[in-house]
Amino acid sequence: MPQVSLEGLRWYDFYGVELPFSAMAGPRDTRRGVAAGFAHDPLGALLASVNIGVRANAQWGPRIFTAVIRGQITGPGTAALLANCQASYDQASRSEGVTGGQPLGNADVAEEAFRWAAYTPAAAVIDLVSAGPGPQGTTVRASTRLQVVWDGGDWKVIAPPGGDWGNSAAELSSLSGYTLFSGQGGGR
């Protein structure tokens, strides 16, 4: 598996989620809520998986998730992912009184760690650990498998099976075997 240096990695706030970026590996463009312009190397693949995967979520509203899914997600589950995000957003926005396609609010989650499952210059498979608050002050962790492919001069994320990130995620009880992100973000 590739060795990537996390030295020089910096973090920026995306609606309460600290996301990693690198001056050398990207993202180089974060306009309009989309993160693009990743290096064609292992660090670029890792940063793309985190930045694109987080954005392909109903939480951020249709302006962001639609642009991300249509432009940066590929594979047979893409249409289902878009439909699932829209349905989740519609339901949550009604119950929370959010109007005009606005984001549903900040998220209380940290991107904590990763593990390589596979890497070639054409594709990579990365298990990404996210942590959030659980019952009684505990921290709950999940590992989500993200697949990226080099397509059209940038990394794209392959949609999860059935267009549901839950089909690619599993609860995690230990960070053994994972590489912790360092710096401002990545850690609860």
Predicted region positions:
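Amphipathic, hydrophobic N-terminal targeting peptides for secretion and organelle import
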Residues: 1-13
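Hydrophobic/aromatic beta-strand elements that line small-molecule binding cavities or substrate pockets
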Residues: 113-116, 143-149
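Short, cysteine-centered beta-strand-loop-beta hairpins and adjacent loop/turn segments enriched
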Residues: 132-141
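A mature extracytoplasmic/lumenal domain signature
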Residues: 40, 53-54, 85, 120, ...
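Signature tryptophan residues that serve as conserved aromatic anchors
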Residues: 154-156
